[in-house]
Amino acid sequence: MEERYNPEKVEPLWQAYWNQHQTFKATEDGSKPKYYLLEMFPYPSGKIHMGHVRNYTIGDVVVRYKRMKGFNVLHPMGWDAFGMPAENAAIDNNTHPAAWTYENIRTMRRQLKRMGFSYDWDREIATCRPEYYRWEQWLFLKMLDKDMVYRKESYVNWCDHCQTVLANEQVEQDMCWRCGKPVQQKKLWQWFFRITDFAEDLLVHCDKLPGWPDNVTLMQKNWIGKSQGSEIRFPIQGIDENIPVFTTRPDTLFGSTFMCLAPEHPLVETLSRGTDQAAAVTEFTTRVLNQERSSIALEKYEKEGVFTGAWCINPVTREKMPIYTANFALMEYGTGAVMSVPAHDQRDFDFARKYGLPIKVVIQPPGEPLDPATMIEAYTGQGTLADSGEFSGLGNLEAMGAITRWLENKGLGKTTVSFRLRDWGISRQRYWGTPIPVIHCPDCGIVPVKEETLPVVLPEDAALLDNGGSPLATLDGFARVNCPVCNRADARRETDTMDTFVESSWYFARYCSPRYDKGMFDPAAVAYWMPVDQYIGGVEHAILHLLYSRYFMRVLNTLGLIDFKEPFERLLTQGMVCKETLTCPEHGFIYPDDAETVNDKVICKRCNSDVEVGRVIKMSKSKKNVIDPNALLDQYGADITRLFCLFAAPPEKDLEWNDDGVEGCNRFINRVWRLADRCKSTYIDLLPYSGVVADLKGEPKKLFIKANQTIKKVTDDIEESFHFNTAISAVMELVNAMYSADLDPDQTDMGEVALFCIENIVLLLSPIVPHFCEELWSILGHGPSIVDQPWPDYQKDALLTDEILIVVQVNGKLRSKFSVDAAVSDDFIRKAALADEQVEKYIKGKTIKKVIVVKKKLVNIVV
């Protein structure tokens, strides 16, 4: 046995063994409980980063643990391969996105295999392959047939930098989630999924996901955004049309004195056309639609608007109300129209004061009545209705229902529910994505591609455009096509591609049968494996991928393809990997390898300038506070890297990178290595202890109890909370206890217990540091693989130690501690406490009034 663990030699050997024996290949097996664990699959960016390493290590530990616990495990890996970054990188590197993507996949696959992750690589998928997106196109056609998808012209979120549309969920604080550039509003023809048809069901089931973090379900609830209220119709003066308005405050209707429409509201252009206001309205809407348009951004802007030249009628007062278009009105909320009540809404109050619009008080607070002329701010509290016709005198809460019922009886309104959630716009004006399988015919309109002709393959001869955008429209060989219905030769294929979040909304189901060619998935395989038992990924996907995946399962359920609705039973959102930034006054942010410590100062190796050590933040290429996993693997190997990722912090917390911590893990691994060598060489003719605790005594008994306590602790920490850090700490304590024990070569009991301990240490660590433990397991005389071993069990009788710790207080203050046999009497404990030399100096010469013995725990002496 070598003196130290040699990962460079050991790890490739065991990886080759696992590969040769297809150790992690998954098949359906009804005789075992199934366990499907999945980490969010990566985008093939070129190489893995420490976030990947941590995420996949967490999953791999759980999977290996579950396999040892007797579960039939599915643990697949694949690639979220379509998307703008690949297209942009291909443009920058003068190559094709496919070539760039597949080369990155090869690189990252090698890196993941080097980490020893227990994936079933036979199930590997890449979403850019036609055999994958064929079934996405097939589902699109099924949804189109059931009116679950539609096309319309609408204002959409447009990123000018990426030259494509973004879904609402892909706009983060009015910036593109990919490039961080401002998002504008642009009117385009777009395809939409009717996710709003499932808004209520998605919302209700947020409370039926006990295995999900509360913050994620809360984020989804807030994004879906259900509001109870009233829809009120305001007639437009001069034309036979109404403006529907959603409001949660029908009690203030009598105080509505003007109307505000979102700049992108379809009525804005219609109402202003031909009026003196037309030019001003056009200038205003153009300017506003090029600004940030989220509710967060609007808080930063001064509230402003323009009169459209049109008027509507308040349905209860019958008074004329001017119709404005205003920058604070949003199409994504309600109907895009706001009945403005300046006396009782601060935003409306400020707007009315700015433009000289009337303010009418309709809710009076207790005490001094409000006068619009002297008000300096809106009154938004509770009160009694005033100047509200027959409803005057009612409390405003009571009036909400009364006014809504009156409107319903008059045919002017109704009780309704509004959702913040909007239908999912999936059209993207980029090349590297799934083609949308429809044809546009001048005679037949929108014609679905025939199923038997699927997939509509993305052409490989596209010349990418330097400024972004899709080249598909310029490819006559792709875009020009005969109509499948009437055979017109001038029909055009749809040249938008699908949002890449469509691919990731069902990939987990495809893993169940990735080579199945008769449908999206083999129904029997999905019935066996789905839903995913444990999903692991970042919280940043709470209202993107995670919401879309829940929606997609409802679509598949509605189409009769599956019998469940929720894709993921449990969700773990792991923390980020963080490190301090290093800033050189000459070079800006620098990499850790470009700095060194000299005389307690951090200096730049390139210029010898003092380096500022900044805050600990998420690792990012832009800040250069990154650790290259390849360099770490070269220096320490996979297992020590894995060990640190698990030991440094609980998985749900951020992990602060610490080079000393990595070295500490290296020392621990080699302590275990030397301990195993010592046990094997010292007790060469003995077998591990297989008896019960009652047959042991003295130090072997203590060590045996400690080992059983450790087994229970590690099992509970992995099973119940994924707190691998405390599980590892427990094993470290057992290792320390073994080093402290007298491993007498002539004492059989101690030898057998020592072998029991070291074998269980290896078993407990095997999901965490698998190569290391495979090697030790083999050295200890076992085979063929530790993966096939059952998880160790503990003896319940061996969890309680024979000794108990007694704390001694004098007048309530801690003065001493001592251990005694658990079987001794309270009287013995009392006498021992009084005789303790540390206690004696606090009671000597004093009158002892009382001695209180709390059984098996504490003695309090009152003097």
Swiss-Prot record:
Catalytic reaction annotation: tRNA(Leu) + L-leucine + ATP = L-leucyl-tRNA(Leu) + AMP + diphosphate
GO molecular function: aminoacyl-tRNA deacylase activity; ATP binding; leucine-tRNA ligase activity
GO terms classed as biological process: leucyl-tRNA aminoacylation
Sorted UniProt keywords: Aminoacyl-tRNA synthetase, ATP-binding, Cytoplasm, Ligase, Nucleotide-binding, Protein biosynthesis
GO cellular component: cytosol
Motif interval(s): 'HIGH' region: 42-52
Record's subcellular location: Cytoplasm
EC number: 6.1.1.4
Enzymatic class: ligase
InterPro entries linked to this entry: aa-tRNA-synth_I_CS, aa-tRNA-synth_Ia, Leu-tRNA-ligase, Leu_tRNA-synth_edit, M/V/L/I-tRNA-synth_anticd-bd, Methionyl/Leucyl_tRNA_Synth, Rossmann-like_a/b/a_fold, tRNAsynth_Ia_anticodon-bd
Residue span of motif 'KMSKS' region: 618-622
Binding site for ATP: K621
Similarity field: Belongs to the class-I aminoacyl-tRNA synthetase family.
Annotated PANTHER family: LEUCINE--TRNA LIGASE, MITOCHONDRIAL, LEUCYL-TRNA SYNTHETASE
Xref: HAMAP family: Leu_tRNA_synth_B (MF_00049_B)
Family matches, as NCBIfam families: leuS_bact (TIGR00396)
Identification of the protein by name: Leucine--tRNA ligase
Source organism per UniProt: Desulforapulum autotrophicum (strain ATCC 43914 / DSM 3382 / VKM B-1955 / HRM2)
